[in-house]
Amino acid sequence: LYQQGGTVYDEELTKSVLDSDPALKAFKQFTDFYTKYKVSKKLNHLTYFRTGETHIVFMPYTFYANLQAAAPEIKGQWSFAQVPGTVKEDGSVDATVSGTSTGCVIFSNSAHKQAAWEFLKWWTDTEAQVDFGTEIESIQGPSGRYPTANLEALRMLPWSNAELQAILSQCQHTQAMPEAPGGYMTSRYIVSS
């Protein structure tokens, strides 16, 4: 959708604009995967990729840990890259994808706001994120690779140079979908269409 120049909501976030030309073009492209190219609607990405029944999957980079744990027999036979993009009229490639995030909150009625703030500053700091990621991976191996949102910490975790560059490049081409009341239903309706 974003690669087609579209968006999900109007600027005020009061209504969907999924009936716009870019949205309809993106939806057609999306449904073509299933109707024209016969992509399975019930694809078990891990199993089908592991067995070679599908040769490419579009998954979050956290899928890396799943493959490390569940498919050691194909270790070294796969890699990941930035999502392919749409060639624009000027020849540039738009590889924008939508992204989601989670956040940390401190409730306004908390009796320990300052302590909570100090904890969040510590927890999201590079050193804590690297220490946590390293500790988890030392226990679980590569299947425990921690998906930190701290980009400085991400650079310090044991990604290969090619893997790290792919992740960082995709980060530069990720656009958060705005939050709107009831917005959690939007993706459900799109997927079930």
Set out the residue ranges of the language-model regions.
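Glycine-centered hinge/linker elements that transmit conformational signals in sensory
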Residues: 11-42, 83
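A structural signal for well-ordered alpha-helical scaffolds and beta->alpha junctions
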Residues: 20-27, 60, 160, 183, ...
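Short helices/loops that flank or line small-molecule/ion binding pockets
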Residues: 44-57, 192
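Paired acidic/hydrophobic, glycine-rich loop segments that form the ligand-binding mouth/hinge
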Residues: 55-60, 79-81
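C-terminal lobe and pocket-closing loops
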Residues: 64-74, 84-192
